[in-house]
């Protein structure tokens, strides 16, 4: 039975890879600061926008530059600042009500991936007012253009400012919906390093490792292209060169800027080449317990990479060379092991734990099933795994396991 399922998965993935050149992928127009949004407002004829964010961004004053440019250009705006770390269906519906009440014609998401994912799902609800978030989950379910979406990342990690994905949690079902459609790619991305200066060290670490996960999974998968391989390698190099500095010195402009570039490149890479089991397991943990996505990815990543074994040695070796943690003369296996060891070392240096708390044994089978359904057949992983194999990761990362 597994052989037949595996064959179907590989045929499905090959089909997507062959179709990639003709799929309507686009990248957002990149802007270097909020002050430059004036030309966007004029080009898009925006008169009233909904700003989607969270209370932390508001309390830190990070929306001030945005408010200034909106007021200076006579653009009315309403503020939705109740987005949760793992945005929920309720967040999307609350934001939709505010969008409609204020007769908005555009969206600005400022914050981390949560705000951007919430805004993307909101855009989908505007485009499809009769469909629920759950009805739009999956691949290519959204075909209509969403309202103009401007993404302003204040973290360097999620890559949501360039991706076609939005992850929304349904607390009642304790499950995450993955919406993956080309119209969800933001139309504009503001990459301003100054907006990331106040990001706390722990979030700098976990979002940075999130970006690393994107680059790694995009590179080691079986649906890569010359472009996505190049972008992933460049992202890995930038992250290994800059994330520790950004963690230790939040106002180091160059490291913050390089991390934004790395997150963007990793975002483009995984949008076209997809992710893998690291993300699938992390999403199941987030849906079940609200585990922060970047933290889950960082903790899970070494275990999954080790489990891929020989199927990923060559590509992990190439990433190891790019990261500067092994020599080209090292063998594939040695290089791969050095890369995984370097990831563990990065986690330790930045205070990321080896284990996660709160995982219940009785939940593991359901989470593994959800992860398997998310990953197969879509994610072109180096080696296909069964639900039983995926269950092992939850045991490995649980703080009650040895």
Predicted feature locations:
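Carboxylate- and glycine-rich phosphate/diphosphate-binding segment that chelates Mg2+/Mn2+
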Residues: 165-273, 388
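Glycine/threonine-rich beta-strand-loop-alpha-helix active-site module
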Residues: 90-193
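C-terminal catalytic subdomain
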Residues: 273-338, 344
């Amino acid at each position: 039975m597994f052989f037949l399922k595996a064959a179907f998965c590989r045929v499905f993935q090959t089909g997507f890879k062959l179709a990639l050149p003709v799929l309507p992928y686009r990248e957002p127009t990149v802007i270097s600061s909020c002050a430059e949004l004036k030309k966007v407002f004029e080009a898009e004829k925006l008169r009233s926008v909904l700003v989607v964010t969270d209370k932390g961004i508001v309390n830190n004053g990070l929306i001030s530059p945005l408010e200034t440019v909106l007021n200076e250009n006579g653009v009315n705006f309403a503020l939705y600042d109740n987005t949760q770390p793992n945005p929920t269906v309720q967040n999307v519906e609350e934001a939709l009500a505010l969008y409609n009440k204020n007769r908005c014609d555009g969206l600005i998401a400022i914050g981390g991936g949560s705000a951007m994912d919430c805004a993307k799902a909101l855009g989908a609800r505007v485009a499809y007012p009769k469909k629920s978030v759950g009805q739009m989950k999956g691949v290519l379910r959204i075909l209509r253009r969403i309202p103009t979406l401007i993404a302003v990342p204040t973290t360097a990690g999620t890559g949501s400012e360039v991706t076609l994905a939005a992850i929304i949690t349904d607390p009642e079902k304790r499950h995450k919906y993955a919406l993956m459609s080309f119209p969800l790619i933001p139309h504009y991305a503001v990459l301003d390093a100054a907006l990331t200066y106040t990001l706390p060290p722990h979030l700098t670490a976990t979002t940075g490792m999130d970006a690393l996960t994107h680059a790694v999974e995009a590179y080691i998968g079986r649906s890569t292209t010359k472009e996505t391989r190049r972008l992933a390698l460049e992202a890995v190099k930038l992250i290994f060169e800059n994330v520790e500095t950004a963690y230790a010195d939040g106002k180091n402009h160059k490291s913050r800027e390089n991390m934004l570039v790395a997150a963007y490149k990793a975002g483009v890479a995984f949008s076209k080449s997809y992710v893998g089991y690291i993300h699938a397991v992390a999403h199941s943990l987030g849906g079940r317990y609200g585990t922060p996505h970047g933290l889950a990815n960082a903790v899970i990543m070494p275990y999954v990479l080790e489990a891929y074994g020989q199927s990923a040695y060559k590509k992990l070796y190439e990433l190891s060379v790019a990261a500067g943690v092994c020599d080209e003369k090292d063998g594939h296996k040695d290089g791969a092991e050095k890369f995984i060891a370097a990831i563990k070392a990065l986690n330790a240096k930045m205070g990321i734990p080896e284990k996660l708390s709160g995982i219940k044994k009785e939940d593991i089978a359901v989470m593994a099933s959800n992860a398997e359904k998310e990953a197969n057949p879509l994610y072109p992983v180096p080696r296909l795994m069964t639900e039983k194999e995926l269950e092992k990761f939850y045991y490995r990362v649980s703080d009650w396991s040895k």
